Amino acid sequence: MLRRRVSAELPVFPWDTLSDVTAKARAHAGGIVDLSVGTPVDPVAPLIREALAAASAEPGYPTTAGTAALRRSAISALERRYGITGVGEQAVLPVIGTKELIAWLPTLLGLGPDDLVVVPELAYPTYDVGARLAGAQVVVADSLTQVGPRTPALVFINSPSNPTGKVLGVDHLRKVVGWARERGAVIASDECYLGLSWDASPLSVLHPSVSGGDHTGLLAVHSLSKTS
């Protein structure tokens, strides 16, 4: 049986290609402002440190879905911070990291060589990596017209964008949702930076003004490390 050599199909991560220029920038007298990886650099809030310390004597593995209290807390935060309503406890799933979720999502959806995954032109590289790991086809597009007559199985969107900061307006989001639903495609909205905005007010794909109160086929991805 022929085996697919996955490593040969994966792109070179941009951080690897930036190593030389990063070293040069660090040697500069003014130092470097490194925006290449979204690693938290601020001090951990005392409240979080205290909560972790208090839970340090509770060994054991949690359930995959997390505790009911955790899911209720997430639902409350989504409504309080972003105006997202209508999310039930069964619609919330804590994961070990959003990067891992994004990388595995095409595989978890059962996608393969006959399936199409749409990713933004300038975007987090793991969208592309996840599609390739599943053996799916990748289309790089920032507009629906670029996809053409083809029918995707999964569409990644990212607002506010990493790395450009671009925010997709409500009309644009509604159009993408309608377009995807007409084709039976799942939308995975990477909303890790939803709470970080300046001039524009970003909206979740789950917001009533975007989804119409129907979350069918919509997946919003949030990141604890970007909001804590």
Residue ranges and their predicted role:
Residues 25-28, 134, 182-183:
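Helix C-cap/helix->beta junction micro-motif
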Residues 36, 222-225:
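Active-site beta-alpha turn of Rossmann-fold NAD(P)-dependent dehydrogenases/reductases
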